[in-house]
Amino acid sequence: RFIVFFNDKLYLMKYRRWIVRSCNLRGSLVSWQADQKKNGGDDKMKTALVTDGKYRSSIAAVRALHRAGYRVVVTQTRADVKSAPAVSVSKSCDDFRWIDGVCADADYAEKLLSVLKEYEHPVLFCVGAVTLNTVAARREEFAALANFLIAPKETLDVLNDKESVHQRALELGIPVPREYDGTPESYPVVVKPHCGEKFGLKAADRYAVANNEAEFDVIMEKMQRYDPSPIVQQKITGAGAGVSLLLGRESELLGALCHRRVREYPITGGPSTCCESFYDEKMIDEAYELLKSFHFTGLAMVEFKGDCILEVNPRVWGSFPMTEAAQSPIVAHYAQAAQGGQVTYTAKDYRTGVKMRFFLNDTVAALSYLKAGRVKEGLRGLGDFFTAKEALSAKGDGKVMRAYLKKSLFER
């Protein structure tokens, strides 16, 4: 024992100076890492800032950007939520930043600009429509501090107007539903305002279906509270689908992803609760032709029903998590192109046949189908619990789903 102790003592004495130097170096390394974290990372790791963390679509964007090698910062306006959003506990979220007030505040742009100044020209990824429009209205100011692909405010406004999209599609020879100026000649018809989002309507309230004249009169009276001349269109039968596109600064096509609706809630017509990825070259070509005609830049989803184009969402869309489920590189391509990097469009660069569901919403949808007597659809929905990918889940990042469920079920 004495020999061992003696040898250990000699060993420690011999390497004492080396140990001291190592400890000093370690202390310096810790300080350097802290400085790097404060300044947005080292030279090899660039920063991406994702806004509006309260939206579940932000989770997919954060994970994709982190995987692409970015240090991801998430922002959220404090008064718009009751507690920190689920994305804040994601392993892919390197930093979470509160912004005082709500995103509708007059000084929101200045607050967001102030946050951006703390980083070295980060990639800016806007999730919420209000933030997107805020940046679009002051593109030059934001472009001096961040990299992004966002169309001018005027372009976003035109694309948000369903009638403008309808007329442009007609000019391009792209199929659209028939419209009625007065009382419809036949039913059913769909009644919707020119831009439901502008009036603060939830997705499920942005249109209504009239099966006869009596229903039409009631719906028109309700819709005219928001829009004095709502759009009246023939109701198209067929599967609903979305073609999501990424366009560069010169409106060049950089990425595409198709998905079809499997279920929705309310089941009479509402947001998608389950969808499946697929590929359709014709639909992509038509969607791209439409967006290109507006000289669009950025991310958008063109909504189809059957062969007809219904509308355009010129922003991050509700089923955006499909980009992760189908392993689409569209988010990474957004960041790369925003920084001036070269991105070449590759057709079908994602997995097809991937089903994705939003657990809570889709469970309610499946039960609603059963209650309505549509047993096969209801049972199929319950069966997808075991086969479809959960939109917000990811291996090794389970805290996010648990936080989301807790907020959804218990936070009012």
Task: Give residue spans per PLM region.
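ATP-binding N-terminal substructure of ATP-dependent carboxylate-amine bond-forming enzymes
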Residues: 2-19, 24, 40-149, 405, ...
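Serine residues within intrinsically disordered or low-complexity segments
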Residues: 22, 28-31
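Short, acidic/small-residue loops that bind anionic groups at enzyme active sites
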Residues: 145-159
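Active-site nucleotide/adenylate-binding loops and adjacent lid/helix of ATP-dependent enzymes
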Residues: 156-230, 237, 249-252, 281
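A short beta-strand motif that forms the metal-chelation/ATP-contact edge
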Residues: 190-192, 245, 306-316
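ATP-dependent carboxylate/phosphate-activation module, predominantly the ATP-grasp catalytic core
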Residues: 205, 211-214, 234-240, 244-295, ...
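A short glycine-rich, hydrophobically flanked beta-strand micro-motif that places a catalytic Asp/Glu
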Residues: 297-306
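Peripheral (often C-terminal) accessory segments that flank ATP-dependent C-N-forming ligase machineries
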Residues: 336-412
